[in-house]
Amino acid sequence: MSAATASVGKAYALKFISGKYQGGEYPLKMERQVIIGRSSDLDMVLVEDMVSRKHAKITLTGGKITIEDLGSTNGTFVNGEKVKQARLKEGDRILIGTSILKLVHQGDHAAEMDDQQVRQRLEEAAAVHAAKSPKSSSMAGKIEEVPLPDLLQLLNTSKKNGVLVVKNVEEGRIYLRQGRVYYAVIDDNHALGPRKSFNRIVTWEAGDFELRPAEPQEFMVELEAPTEVLLMEGMRLLDEFKRIQNELPPLNSVLMLSMPMTSPLRELSADELDILQLAHNYGSLKGVLDHSEKEDVAAAEIVLGLLKRDFVRAG
């Protein structure tokens, strides 16, 4: 058995990282089947429209953990892929309806609970979650538990509609139509543009997410690229930005024209002159990135060049 595959010598559980039971865990017992669905007589009951009466089955037997879709209407997804049957490994994320469950290791000394205790613990988790977020949607959680690229892939494959609201210091909104991202905005700053907003939001590594119902809102400009392409481009730009990040001043630090400016302006290209003007007009790296027509990485690289050649200085 490969190291990546769940070993039945360990104790495992399904941890709810979104949905009604967010924060709760369902222990998995060896040589047992767990039937998941909407019907009240099943092992794990998920009462919601997108879950079939008998939706999926998880089996722990013969040295492996597997999941099987039971002919559900809306499908069963593992790590963003719709599956009929799949072998699970630790860390896998399962999407059923609006619940995301993660296969986790419980530890060698996990307390043994009977079925009634398990259900009681889940209901306690549901009560805590409801008390914290009484008005929240059924699909909500923390980015630390499910990174945004993974979440967007799940939503894309399962063709979800709605608005994914992501909050850390800022609030980002990603609009979905049949799972496809068609618009994004940060703090209602539509001037930033949907592509730049999306590329920034997907890099956030901490905060809360919530999938809200679709809004009857139209936008002048929509994103046309497939979600997979948007995600690949966003991750590429993130890698490039991290490469130069340590050389850049903090986003909100002051940028000012060098006084005296010893190098002649004629040495600068048209793009460099544009960025120099933005630095003069808005006075910070964030101001430059927000107002430049270029992607953040390209604009930041030009700022870095201007700093090194002493056309601008960071205060």
Label the model's feature ranges.
Residues 1-74, 78-315:
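Acidic, Ser/Thr/Pro-enriched low-complexity segments and adjacent helix/loop capping patches
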